[in-house]
Amino acid sequence: MATSALIPVSEYLSKVYEPDCDYIEGHLEERNLGELGHSSLQGILWGIFHVNRGAWGVLAYPELRIQVAAERYRVPDITVLRRSDPKDPIVRVPPLLCIEVLSPEDRMQRMQERIGDYFRMGVAHV
């Protein structure tokens, strides 16, 4: 899953990966996505937040980079920001909510690491 050669954070931030990947202390980590069930659920959840964005005071984004620590960047399936949060290209303040849609290939330890990163950053809801 992770590459063996260390990649500088500046290189990660200057490149576009298709699909986007996480950056963990110099290593790129691929994410499990692209299957019909995963994409369908991601779209439905994003749609719920998008339709209610005005009433709830939120903005939802699919696959947005979040800097969870100095050398750690995660790309949740859906990030929900408060309307008042900064609108920077990379999120550096704790979002209101990070959603990870699980795929059959996802493993408990890897998910616990992702969720732990969000909680340590200060995300209240995962």
For each of these PLM feature ranges, what is it?
Residues 1-125:
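Gly/Pro/Ser/Thr-rich low-complexity, intrinsically disordered segments predominantly at protein N-termini
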